[in-house]
């Protein structure tokens, strides 16, 4: 294949009224650089932000130039003489969402509406040697009744960019050439089935040709070679072959081995050659568990919501995706779910190299609960989404990382349509596992291989729905859900704990997007006098969120034969009214809460687990059960648990045992303490914090009855109980932080609490500078009062971390009646 690169400067003509129907010859226009978007080229309505702090402003970053209408691009191209008689294709790697093409004044084919795969136009016979004018009409309007929620088409994520990104080129092949190659590894791992589609220039008569195959390993060594004669009698001839591949190396997260299939097609004087990378792997379900090449796997995942804060459109080069997806691997994860969108080729190639298991979706999030159409409300859904699913399968199906497919996110409506799509694609392409939709517990259909939801058979499978149980001990699991669900279960969008936003990121938005939502957050904080506390707020809320993420993850790991979990998410989501739920920001940078090594200790392939109460007295024993989540490269053998219990730097107890049980007296403590329990198995270790309270009689405290008495004790010092009635403005407290976004799901709840752990009032009460489970009951039964704005004299012992939309500083004052 020869390539004629069309990147560079085109001419642009805007069409906000959608009044132009044809190019009308050559025209002058504004310069437009491809690859790129209208926003990057300064085309559209400039964004004017004047300081609003309303919910719409807080929705998401916005393009600096907005354009939602048809857009025309034009340029000349010089076709060399040796292109005569060749097959020519225009390749546009990614367009949002529709394109039409003219060569000179001739329209080529029909409008392509496609969000997930390249737009291609067959120009064979249309581009003779010499100069021609190419004209593109792009259209980013919602032509498919998608609504505005799916990550693949939403102002919350990519925004409605318009342009062409990635490769933009003319591809020139011989008239007889290989149009497509699909590789299907066999379950026995010693052969592959190869399906070729060859374009033939003389379909009016039978012809003959040869297809020669070579399979090379990662070092370039030829491991299989085969030649086949084929009879050709149609313009796109499909042939099926089986190639032996003995002693194949499997592709997986630990050994992401890939092979290269070289396909050479000869027909008369035409010779065409193409390369296809693939991995030897077979995914299956057995006994409600995932198996990859006969070995059980467990998914530890996060979600990618198509947020690209500098460009507003997906990265199209592999290096960018190696960095983006490599972060998930660095943090111990082996799985990424693409939320209501399908990434470009470069993402799959990077995941293949990294050994990541991908779940891919169409740009489909349709249900009336979020004020958009439901599945099937528009007749276009029936034809478009089936074709979209088939296109995704064909375009990216050879990638070994592409293990799971869902039609989209949280879909409701015509489930028979989703069933038709799933059954049809699964019948054609069995290389992955399928489910109707991500989320929503529903009666499972025969075409579904797994369930991804937050309820399974009516049972919750994320801690959001069982926080009280999780607070009692470290033993929560989802065994009931596994027992009552006939397929593997993946817990859906685990976490969503709001961390106070870091508005310092505003300076990092140096590209097409302007973070007016973060500018509004900053203004609200400045108005409330808390902007200078933002880093302390991030530390306190982030550490609480990290604690809760750890509990969520470990509940999944403790559940025997559980399919896995998907976090929402490792990184912030800056749309949907600003959901800063990540331990990393939207640029993939750490917030300084946990390092990758610390996170991997409880989210990696091998994780020691500890089941025990969280709160004890000094008269009790620490009774605990030990176990190992063991999904490493090889099963651990002859387990020995190395247990160290520390109070600060001092070792309280150290035990090595092969028995998975602990029975340790706590009577050696004569004071209240927080103990850090570390369990190590080989080179893997994990830690938990438990709280031990001295078994001492309650000490009676005087009760303050009037404001004057309260003022006196504040002046002279001392301890007293202050009833809530003395505070005119009572704000309920909470332990679990705001879910997702306090604007998307309106909430006045806090995001944690800052604690002056060294204050004498907390003497004898073990605590860090942020909340842990020993605070849960106290906070949930407490009220807070507001601190006067900019009152430096008030130094609270506890201060709530406010959510960014309800910013007045306030601190817990005592238990409610």
Task: Locate each region found by the language model.
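Substrate-binding/catalytic cleft of secreted carbohydrate-active enzymes
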Residues: 335-585
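Aromatic-rich peripheral "rim/lid" segments of glycoside hydrolase catalytic domains that contact
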Residues: 428, 568-631
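Short alpha-beta junction capping motif
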Residues: 702-741, 817
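N-terminal carbohydrate-binding accessory modules
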Residues: 181-183, 250, 262-328, 349
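Short glycine/proline/serine/threonine-rich loop/turn segments at secondary-structure transition edges
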Residues: 83-86, 127-131, 144, 205, ...
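Accessory beta-strand-rich segments of carbohydrate-active enzymes
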Residues: 4, 8-17, 29, 41-43, ...
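Catalytic beta-strand/loop cores that center a nucleophilic Ser/Cys/Thr
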Residues: 726-729, 741-817
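Beta-strand-rich binding/interaction modules
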Residues: 101-103, 190-230, 239, 621-665, ...
